[in-house]
Amino acid sequence: MRLKQDFFEQLPEFYSQVFPLGISNPHWLAWSQDAADLIEIKQPSDELLQGLSGNAHVDGASYYAQVYSGHQFGGYSPQLGDGRSIILGEALGPQGAWDVALKGAGPTPYSRHGDGRAVMRSAVREFLISEALHHLHIPTTRALAVIGSDLPVWRESQETAAITVRLAKSHIRFGHFEYFCHSERGAPAKLKQLLDFTIKQHYPDLSCDAVGYKAWFTRVVADTAKMIANWQAIGFAHGVMNTDNMSILGDTFDFGPFAFLDTFKEGFICNHSDPEGRYAFGQQPGIGLWNLQRLAQALSPIIASDDLIESLNQYQVELVKHYLLLMRGKLGLKTSAAEAEQDDHDLALIGAFTGLMERNQLDHTNTWRRFGQLDPNASHSSLRDDFVDLHGFDTWYQAYQVRLGSVDEVGLWQKERNQVNPKYILRNYLAQEAIIAVELGDLKPLHNLQRLLQNPFDEQLEFEDMAKRPPDWGQGLIMSCSS
């Protein structure tokens, strides 16, 4: 692993240097070779295990925790920072550099009286969701590995510590900019320093001047809108959309009590700490804009207000455009021109179908997958049998067929639907079963689940049971932020 230290060397006021404590009896629990290839690691090794567990120094590593602030559940927290994540530096690879971070490596100056550790269950969940989202083609940070230990840690009860090795194209968050705006820490000079660094590292085609700043913020708005459109189309609820959990690159970031939808429910809440549903599934598009507005506020000392507002006004446009692209793919709809009238018609058609799904309490993923078995030219649809409200479905299906038109190659059309409507997602109960098995010393369910998630659009008949609706105990599991 070849490391460079651009952030560490160029932004000394944006972090504190801190070294990992190490863990006892480190051992590999999970490994992603896909992620390893990004930074040219051929295979796991004992030497790498000792380095990534914090028990030995990694050549070229600087070890630091970044500082930032953020809006958490709508309220501003003036100092947050990496409370249990220690970054080694940026590892070089064929697709560019990736930050390497040890999540759960011990306390930092930003731990806020915490122990700086991560428990095994949260480490495994982050690993699995990183694999799942990547293979669903949704922008995300990656997880290289989970390292287990026999180190006890206390949450609600005694658990075992683990480390997630996270890879990110950048760890810069909306909250980094907020930290240097809402303080006496040298803004706007520090804001400009951070923004220029971000542009040079990740948007090298842009200039570090007023024109480049506006173009950059416009891209951040568009990338954030696309990320959230992906979430809404696939049925993913992040759970903790605080501004310190928002990547400046539009990557899904900082996983806690996330969930995929089981039964479709617009108001689904996956976070036990969010009883009012601020971050409910259906609220995510609006929260995305709210967070971008907080970022714009932080940038206002160095970017003209008119430029910020103009870029923010593109959020809804980009969100709808990308959402329609994804949902038309799921339904097999073609469009030759992006006319507003057609867009409005298709949004109404999509909304009518998701409304039917909710009223009939249908499984989100399985219902969309059924389009791969549908004969779109037939007057009677096998999909109809899933609905209790037959009249509602018939009315919708008639409108759908009119919009769809005649399909010449039904087999090809069905195959295309199966390439965008996954058969398998990371259901919370599947993750929980894998975690329980790990606690009992059995890694096979975890590794099988990882293999399943690497090919979510394939039939994988040996894992057929994992596509079924959850058992009663696993339906709509709500997780806590405890990790």
From Swiss-Prot:
GO molecular function: AMPylase activity; ATP binding; magnesium ion binding
Entry EC number(s): 2.7.7.-, 2.7.7.108
Keywords, sorted A to Z: ATP-binding, Magnesium, Manganese, Metal-binding, Nucleotide-binding, Nucleotidyltransferase, Transferase
ATP-binding keyword on record: yes
Pfam annotation, one family: SelO
Enzyme class, spelled out: transferase
Listed cofactors: Mg(2+); Mn(2+)
Binding positions (ATP): 81, 83-84, 103, 115-116, 166, 173, 254
Residues of the active site: 244 (proton acceptor)
Family statement: Belongs to the SELO family.
Record function comment: Nucleotidyltransferase involved in the post-translational modification of proteins. It can catalyze the addition of adenosine monophosphate (AMP) or uridine monophosphate (UMP) to a protein, resulting in modifications known as AMPylation and UMPylation.
PANTHER family for this protein: PROTEIN ADENYLYLTRANSFERASE SELO, MITOCHONDRIAL (PTHR32057:SF14)
NCBIfam families: PRK00029.1 (NF000658)
Protein name (database record): Protein nucleotidyltransferase YdiU
Record organism: Shewanella pealeana (strain ATCC 700345 / ANG-SQ1)
